[in-house]
Amino acid sequence: KSTWLTKTRNIWSAPSPTHLMISMITWPVMSNSPNNVLNIEGCPSLYKFNPFRGGLNRIVEWILAPEEPKALVYADNIYIVHSNTWYSIDLEKGEANCTRQHMQAAMYYILTRGWSDNGDPMFNQTWATFAMNIAPALVVDSSCLIMNLQIKTYGQGSGNAATFINNHLLSTLVLDQWNLMRQPRPDSEEFKSIEDKLGINFKIERSIDDIRGKLRQLVPLAQPGYLSGGVEPEQSSPTVELDLLGWSATYSKDLGIYVPVLDKERLFCSAAYPKGVENKSLKSKVGIEQAYKVVRYEALRLVGGWNYPLLNKACKNNAGAARRHLEAKGFPLDEFLAEWSELSEFGEAFEGFNIKLTVTSESLAELNKPVPPKPPNVNRPVNTGGLKAVSNALKTGRYRNEAGLSGLVLLATARSRLQDAVKAKAEAEKLHKSKPDDPDADWFERSETLSDLLEKADIASKVAHSALVETSDALEAVQSTSVYTPKYPEVKNPQTASNPVVGLHLPAKRATGVQAALLGAGTSR
């Protein structure tokens, strides 16, 4: 109860079509560009990071490398290695600090990633308008309803289809400012001043001194277990709790690499409090709860339970009991477990892994066996001209130009009008080639046909001329070097900003009184 003011999020609720339309803008680009620190040297992004298959080991090797300072970023999480110290930094109110201008910049970036091979933008004027104007207005600084009250909520609502990339942008802004300040220590007053410069709140969740020494100590201290001798563990191997997206590191003597285990707090909470079947559409199946138990207990062992003897034994026994129950009732075990990835909240982490077998030393070794990095998702030489134009638009603020939508609408218009011109030309050629079938037809009918042909040809010519003129104007506007000067919103002081849950333009010290009046909770004034 003492932390609900800082932990509560504005969960964004909207009709399904709204979620779908924003997803249609973000997902095609994000899903086809899983480039991250694991497959591109020097890339700080942890997007699509998987700790298994040697993923966490590559991060540990990155930490052990002597070069520093250095940083990684994932949504509202920032990780910095500075002075042999590991810092895990979290945006305290990442969603609340997001502005519409932030989301417009993110949408501008997404739209300008989507180009066809011949250089046409893969969106039209409608999508550009929705992405740049409508979506940010719906998601950021929107209003919520409590009974018959309409209350302003600041920042973006958590749970929208652009939450990740918006938070990723905010974290990147923090890192950019950190680089401009010549990378001060995260626990210094200079680093903390970034909050006031950007209006973005953050806090250091965890710091580990002598991070390289602690990681190296894991090697000689590894205890016999599934991945160190191929036996059931009798004693836990030590871990370093990096808080790397919830993962800690331990060492495997058999594989000779660092392997992931879920942070203790998360692991034991997950063991104590089951979430239930992940895919709610499966809940009506008879026997699904027992199948869920099999998957859940085996998954708990895979994500780190194998390292803790008591938890490992309990999960192993419970999974075995659930299997025997399904077999005794005559339920097709293989049919249930074929959908295991939709049963457990851990499903996405085990890509290409078959969980139908009980966890063994061999299966754990297979899950953690390193695989070569995926090549960058680039199938042809990158044309950096477009990237430079986008970068310039972001730096100068042209992407905020509501009249021109930073040229996105103009480009989309140019594309559609050029298509109109091509169609008009084709129609004119078609009309020009067409002739009456009967050369001896009545002269009146032939004159009517000729008049119709001339009228359509004239229309086609006007459409083509208009399209080319508009295309020329659009391209000139896009190539314009004029800088748009936006009206920046007043940057909120993090110390006196309204509470993001309630808002109402009230200082934070009065927010609890508003909550008490509306909700019967909190501290009265």
From Swiss-Prot:
GO biological processes: viral genome replication
Keyword annotations from UniProtKB, A to Z: Covalent protein-RNA linkage, GTP-binding, Nucleotide-binding, Nucleotidyltransferase, Phosphoprotein, RNA-directed RNA polymerase, Transferase, Viral RNA replication, Virion
PTM info: May exist in multiple phosphorylated forms.
Keyword Transcription regulation part of the UniProt annotation: no
Catalytic activity of the protein: RNA(n) + a ribonucleoside 5'-triphosphate = RNA(n+1) + diphosphate
Subcellular compartments: Virion
Enzyme kind, highest EC tier: transferase
Pfam families tied to this protein: Birna_RdRp_C, Birna_RdRp_palm, Birna_VP1_thumb
UniProt GO cellular component terms: virion component
Superkingdom assignment: Viruses
EC number(s) per entry: 2.7.7.48
Gene Ontology terms, MF aspect: GTP binding; RNA-directed RNA polymerase activity
Domain annotation RdRp catalytic: ranges: 72-272
Function: RNA-dependent RNA polymerase which is found both free and covalently attached to the genomic RNA. May also contain guanylyl and methyl transferase activities.
Assembly and oligomerization: Interacts with VP3 in the cytoplasm.
Listed name of the protein: RNA-directed RNA polymerase
Source organism: Avian infectious bursal disease virus (strain 52/70)
